[in-house]
A protein has these predicted regions:
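Extended, hydrophobic alpha-helical segments in both membrane/secreted and soluble proteins
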Residues: 45-112, 128, 132, 197, ...
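A glycine-rich phosphate-binding loop feature that marks nucleotide/adenosyl-phosphate handling sites
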Residues: 3-9, 74-79, 111-124, 213-221, ...
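Conserved small/polar residues in nucleotide/adenosyl-binding loops
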Residues: 288-295
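N-terminal glycine-rich phosphate/pyrophosphate-binding loops that anchor nucleotide-derived ligands
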Residues: 1-66, 101-105, 117-125, 150
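Active-site-proximal betaalpha loop/short-helix elements
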Residues: 186-253
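Short, acidic (Asp/Glu-rich) active-site segment that either coordinates a divalent metal cofactor
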Residues: 33-35, 68, 149-179
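Flexible, glycine/charged-enriched surface loops at secondary-structure junctions
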Residues: 1-4, 67-74, 106-114, 168, ...
Length: 298
């Protein structure tokens, strides 16, 4: 509701409006476009500030990749309680170190930012809340990708390995009422490798739609893509040792949902294999129908 109140079509150059992974605006007189995304995750940073700092940079990186943009740089807004409190200051230091580590590895530099301390009521500070704004470049905006499912019978893949991490997830905190445990681990090699491989696939016109997997896990990402595209999906869980709850609601990092045409599927999977990128096949797009409780169609 909030972002809908703002004018996001100034001069008619907006070619992907808010509500997707990133907003995209054309650059006058060229085929280029700039993508921008803003992300924050107080829950992960509260559970483990260093991992949370890395995660929010990676989330920004993935959001830009998912629209077909090469990530260029980030700015930050770091919101914390009183630095006079040792715990608050420790959270700040760990979070900044995590941001720096991810930025350096992903070649996604911090070029500006600000710090806001003393965010508290009486002596109780807010959760550590770093906010990252990322920008990326699309060399040809005709290759921009959106998240909505496009075509019936196209194949849906998950790029990236699913381990079934449930601690600190939306599902665990809001459905299971479990608020302890660490956030998902960040593997920076996989983040970079998965993202750069997907970007190559997008640039070679092999991907029809894409969306990163974040809060709510695979099931939430799939639901958004179905709703946006007014499509359904014949959803199947790969034969993993983890159970369905862990597979569909886990918030393991470095993952994307992508839509691929059947004629391009072999090309895509060969490229993923060649680059050592794990993937699972989830199912195929359907005409939208009301789901039956006896099946796993969405």
């Amino acid at each position: 509701w909030i972002w809908q109140q703002y004018d996001h079509t100034v001069m008619g150059d907006t070619i992907q409006k808010p509500g997707g992974d990133a907003g995209v605006v054309r650059v006058h007189g060229t085929n280029k476009a700039v993508a921008a995304s803003v992300d924050s995750s107080a829950v992960y940073c509260w559970a483990h500030p260093h991992t949370g700092g890395k995660q929010i940079v990676c989330e920004s990186f993935r959001n830009l990749i998912a629209v077909g943009a090469k990530p260029i740089a980030i700015t930050n807004c770091l919101n914390f309680g009183s630095p006079e409190n040792e715990e608050n200051m420790g959270e700040f230091v760990e979070c900044v170190q995590g941001i720096g580590e991810a930025s350096e590895y992903l070649k996604f530099p911090v070029v500006s930012g600000n710090v806001s301390f003393y965010n508290q009521t009486k002596d109780k500070g807010i959760k550590p809340t770093p906010t990252i704004g990322g920008v990326g470049l699309i060399m040809d905006y005709n290759k921009m990708i959106t998240m909505d499912f496009k075509q019936i019978d196209n194949v849906i893949l998950v790029i990236g390995k699913t381990e079934g991490h449930l601690d600190q997830t939306l599902f665990a905190r809001n459905i299971l009422d479990e608020k302890n445990g660490p956030p998902p681990e960040i593997n920076l090699f996989n983040e970079k490798n998965n993202g750069e491989t997907l970007l190559k696939l997008i640039q070679n016109d092999l991907i029809k739609s894409a969306h990163d997997v974040s809060l709510g896990g695979i099931i939430t990402a799939i639901a958004k893509m179905c709703i946006k595209g007014k499509k359904g999906i014949n959803l199947n869980k790969p034969k993993y040792l983890i159970n369905e709850m862990e597979y569909f609601f886990g918030e393991d990092q470095g993952r994307y949902i992508v839509e691929v045409s059947k004629k391009d599927l072999k090309k895509v999977t060969d490229i993923l294999d060649k680059n050592a990128v794990h993937f699972d096949e989830l199912g195929t797009c359907l005409l939208y129908t009301s789901p039956s409780p006896r099946d796993r169609s969405i």
